[in-house]
A protein has these predicted regions:
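Catalytic Walker B motif of ABC-type/P-loop ATPase nucleotide-binding domains
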Residues: 155-159
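Conserved ABC ATPase "signature" region
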Residues: 93, 108-126
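Conserved ABC ATPase signature
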Residues: 130-134, 138
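ABC ATPase nucleotide-binding domains
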Residues: 229-257
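H-loop/switch region of ABC-family ATPase nucleotide-binding domains
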Residues: 191-192
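Conserved catalytic motifs of ABC-family nucleotide-binding domains
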Residues: 151
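Helix-to-loop junction immediately C-terminal to a conserved catalytic motif
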Residues: 53
């Protein structure tokens, strides 16, 4: 990680109309970061993500983006009508639209790059299979390939392992980690699953009562912070340089069934 900021939130207030969701957001995403954003459902993760992507404007404050910033975005799920006979390659080619334009046919170099992205995620052999016929893990890899086709310097993933089985989840997260470590790609990983972010992120943000707490994982993966954010007693353990977070069992009073 360098100290070159790709995105800077400066005293930002976010919300919808008169409803304020987050306030006084101070956040720098640096080149080479692996930044994890966590918080319970309804805490404002989607709102902050929409602002990061440029979809939602701040109510107050400023969001500064580095010149030449290209964001590849992997959504939770792709809402495609199953009647559309789109192949995996068709989906990945969508990532070329910012470069080529929506109404222009993909050029040879666009197709070559899309195939390279599919190969990168291990799905070159499935390029011409219908997207709707792929497994959940394969679909997620296709969405990552589409984001890589943007040729991003910042990759944003929203709940990338939601609904996947454990082996597929581990494979997807391992691939994301390799993109960061070997390719030097800056990562923002959004998840409600603490253990996912705790294992991979070097810096993180925790959403708490309309505020964003930012720091190193070691600073924020503390029982007091997480209990306040999630409203349940937790236990934090560190194993092999990784954190394990679990809900603490509460002793029942005598006579409770």
């Amino acid at each position: 990680m360098t100290h070159e900021p790709l995105v800077q939130f400066q005293n930002v207030q976010l919300g919808y109309g008169r409803q304020v969701v987050l306030q006084n957001v101070q956040l720098d995403i640096f080149r080479g970061d692996f930044f994890g954003l966590v918080g319970p459902n309804g805490s404002g993760k989607t709102t902050l993500l929409r602002c990061l992507l440029g979809i939602l404007k701040p109510l107050r404050g400023q969001v500064a983006r580095a010149e030449g910033l290209r964001i590849g975005y992997v959504p939770q799920r792709e809402m495609l009508d199953p009647l559309f006979p789109l192949t995996a390659l068709d989906i990945v080619l969508m990532g070329r639209y910012p470069h080529a334009g929506i109404f222009r046919s993909p050029r040879r170099n666009d197709r070559e790059l899309a195939m390279q992205c599919l190969e990168q995620v291990g799905l070159a052999d499935s390029a011409h299979k219908l997207y709707r016929e792929l497994s959940g893990g394969q679909r997620q890899r296709v969405l990552i390939a589409r984001a890589l086709a943007v040729e991003p310097n910042l990759l944003v993933l929203d709940e990338p392992t939601n609904g996947l089985d454990l082996p597929t989840e581990a494979a997807i997260l391992g691939f994301i980690e390799r993109l960061h470590q070997h390719d030097g790609l800056t990562i923002v990983l959004v998840s409600h699953v603490l253990n996912v972010v705790a294992r991979y992120a070097s810096r993180m943000g925790v959403l708490l009562d309309g505020r964003l707490l930012v720091g190193d994982a070691e600073q924020l993966i503390q029982e007091q912070v997480l209990e306040e954010a999630y409203g349940v007693p937790v236990c934090v353990q560190r194993l092999d340089h990784h954190y394990l977070v679990a809900v603490r069992e509460v002793e029942r009073a005598d006579g409770d069934g």
